[in-house]
Amino acid sequence: SGRSYGTSYLLSMKDLNTIDHIEDLKSIDSLKIEGRMKEPAYVANVVKRYRKALDEGTDQVEREALQKTFNRTYTEGYMFGEDPGSITNIQRPNNFGYEIGTVRGSFKGMYEIALTKTLHQNDIIRIDHENEDVNLSVARLYDQEGKLINQADDTCYIKIKEKLSPGDVVYKTKDYLFYKGLDADLDKEFRRFPLDLKVYAYPGAALVIDAE
């Protein structure tokens, strides 16, 4: 159409998320989880959420858990009538994260952040300042008295060298404790059992494999 998109990421696809349509998908014999070039924690998280949705249905807790690993926001895809113009996130090619609060202002050499979701020490966040990202790992988290804390639920204070403004939106891109849980799941020894295979292969005949 001749439109200019500047430096936008035209091939940056949103993540396909059909968990709210799990009842429509149950008749399919096998669901493929897209994990190419994704970290093990991403695959573990998505498989776990869809497995639980298939067995027990889904709820808001499971929907929010999906957001805690890599995503470029979500699309329901062509199968469920998504507008073709809405399947890409042209603003960014990397992890979008999920919103957890806003910058309220500066206070004693730190920035005060009003939280809508819990923030833990060692979480990784990004702050949208004038359409530019400020990314940091929360190595130190403070309360209003300047005391170090491990987590905050409503208001916290962080030392950030970059300039920020009141109203800048804060996103969490990595939940430290959530990832520790996923890593523990990945480290578990899965049950192993013996399997006897007999393979029959003859020229011009179909390959037959018997498993016992």
Predicted regions mapped to residue ranges:
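Surface-exposed amphipathic alpha-helical tracts and adjacent flexible/coil segments at the periphery
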Residues: 1-212
